[in-house]
Amino acid sequence: MKKVIPIVGISILVMIVAKAQDPAKVDPAHYKVIFNNPQVRVLDVRLKPGEKTPVHSHPNLVVYSLTGGTIKSTTADGKTTTVTTKPGQVGWRNAQTHISENVGKTEIHALGIELKR
């Protein structure tokens, strides 16, 4: 019985994390789908200073910064990167599961273009 409880607990956690990956579903306050077709999905992303997202996943994506800002990203393996962007800056992100946090002093507003193919 002692072995069953941890296995059940881990199984439940895995199911929660697996379902909690789509940013538009787990964090609609920060992610809004503004376009979706079989090739791409475009997310409107907004984070005020100090705001943090829950754990979520993206496929490969292009990020277009509408405003500048400083964002910290912590991946599922615990790696942390901090990036400062300028308005109009474009960047590539490999598919990943992560948490994002606005560690700057201004609201971050960006478009995330997720590639489906």
Question: Which residues are covered by each model-predicted region?
Answer:
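Positively charged n-region of N-terminal signal peptides that target proteins for export
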Residues: 1-4
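Bacterial N-terminal signal peptides
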Residues: 6-15
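Sec/Tat signal peptide C-region and signal peptidase I cleavage site
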Residues: 16-20
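A short glycine-rich, His/Asp/Glu-containing loop-to-beta-strand
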Residues: 27-52, 63, 113
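Short acidic-glycine-tyrosine-enriched beta hairpin
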Residues: 36, 77-95
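Histidine-centered metal-chelating micro-motifs
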Residues: 50-53, 89-101
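Glycine- and acidic-residue-biased ligand/ion/polar-headgroup-sensing regions
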Residues: 58-77
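Ligand-binding loop in jelly-roll beta-barrel domains
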Residues: 68, 95-116
